[in-house]
Amino acid sequence: VPKNDHGPFSHEGEQYWGPVNWDNGGMEHTTLHLLYSRFWHKFLYDIGVVHTKEPYAKRTSHGMILGQNPHYVGNVSTQEEKDALIAKYGNQALRPAVKMVKTLGNVVNPDDVVKAYGADTMRLYIMFIGDFEKVATWSDDAVKGCKRFLDRVWNLADQVTEEDGVSEKNAPIVHKTIKKVTDDIDTLKMNTAIAALLTMVNEFYSNGLRRGHFEALLRMPSPFAPP
């Protein structure tokens, strides 16, 4: 076990390893763990043990994925049924989506999704569900849509010609999509990056595609659905 008789940790080690480059967490992480980690780090900074005021060079917070609300008034047809739900569940009955909890039976098991649609579909949908930092509602229909997109990419292989490079007809959409996906990944806009890929695939089905088009298409979704 390493020992240091001169301080809580090595000054050289702290200079090398700190601060954390990027810390990400949900809202509960932000209001609980982050509060204490910053408090202790600022204390250590005040007594001269660490060299930065903040423990993290960059901080982001992702949104929560909600589940369907089984007690939502929109699930019933008569006013009497709606009034009964409001009387029993209050304002919660007015929200179509709520936090996933076992007692409501609205928890989505990732293993079930992977078994039904594959891991690539699961990863792609989580990135496509909405803006990184905002709340989003899980949708089984949207999961199926992501699976259809991956199937369309797979089926494009049958339409690839033996010509190399990129045709003049497809060059604009290919280069535009490469830039869009690159920029969006850098700014955590995964959903709009994937939307651009959907558009490009539609163009390929309309215009036909060469080997160069298909190679570009297979590279761009790699962060979401590795080949």
Q: Predicted segment positions?
A:
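Structured secondary-structure scaffolds
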Residues: V1-E162, I173-N202, G212-M220
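Gly/Thr-rich phosphate-binding loop signature of adenosyl cofactor/nucleotide-binding cores
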Residues: E168, P172
